[in-house]
Amino acid sequence: MNGGAPTKIANFLHKSIVSVLALTSLGCGVFVISATADLLERRKKRREEEDRIINEFIENDKKRILEENLRQQQQQQQK
């Protein structure tokens, strides 16, 4: 039982379709990994920016409190 041309054609089509599906899946996987890496990088940058803003706010608040305390001390000394 040789199988003949129809079997060879069917096998070729099957291998071709499986190869296309495998390459498509691989391409999708690469895209997902790339998109995930990009998302993680953007999150990291956003987190760094948030930390910078928070630290800047804290420093400004410390300066404001020190200035307010100094002003109060000066007012008390004037009395």
From Swiss-Prot:
Domain of life: Eukaryota
Ranges that cross the membrane: 15-37
Protein name: Putative uncharacterized protein DDB_G0267482
Locations listed in the record: Membrane
Predominant localisation class: membrane
Keywords: Membrane, Transmembrane, Transmembrane helix
GO cellular component, one term: membrane
Source organism (scientific name): Dictyostelium discoideum
Topological category with respect to the lipid bilayer: Single-pass membrane protein
